[in-house]
Amino acid sequence: MKHFSRYWLVVAVVFGLAGCNNMRTPSDIPLAVPLQPRFEEEVLLIRLEQILSTASLSDKERAELLFERGKLYDSLGLRVLARNDFSQAILLLPNIPEVFSYLGKYLVLEGSLDTAYEAFDSVLELEPTNIDARFERGVALYYGGRYSLAQNDLLEFYRQDPQNPFGVLWLYLIELKMDADVAETALAERYNAAVGHKDWGWMIVDFY
């Protein structure tokens, strides 16, 4: 049943890609500007294209190469090309948690929150201990106004990584929507419980 639900998520993502050029980008989400590829990245892209076009590959091998090329596109800010490769990869091999994680982030940026939740759910089905996916799903739930569920995810993230300033900050922002007084008290307690405050992220927490 879980594999079946992931299949329909893949279908939704692929068909969403076909219409993404017609989507309006929300004004509060900055547009990514593609970076100029370095020589090494250009060579790697050419090599990956040659392998994908000419080599006899198993589905697993092709999916892994598409994933690697998608990550390279993503690092260059080429989201449409990256998402296309990720979508092809999970059609071939729908059990790569990292691909669902990337797609979930894209879907949040596009405002497709329900599908983003499903993408992060798929990551956690494949890797139940993946706390990064729990963090990302919590942030997506925050943007969707589902604050109680978002709090559950960020509390679990905090329990496993209490020294992470961004987990503390997002937990505060979520709880601020629920009860401002409780959020302020909890933020102070978590800040004081952290050791050292050496990570630069704590400087952001200081502003709150």
Language model features with spans:
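N-terminal leader/linker segments that initiate helical-solenoid repeat arrays
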Residues: 20-68, 76
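Residue-level recognition of tetratricopeptide repeat
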Residues: 71, 105, 139, 173-175
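Register position in tetratricopeptide repeats
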Residues: 75, 109-110, 143-144, 177
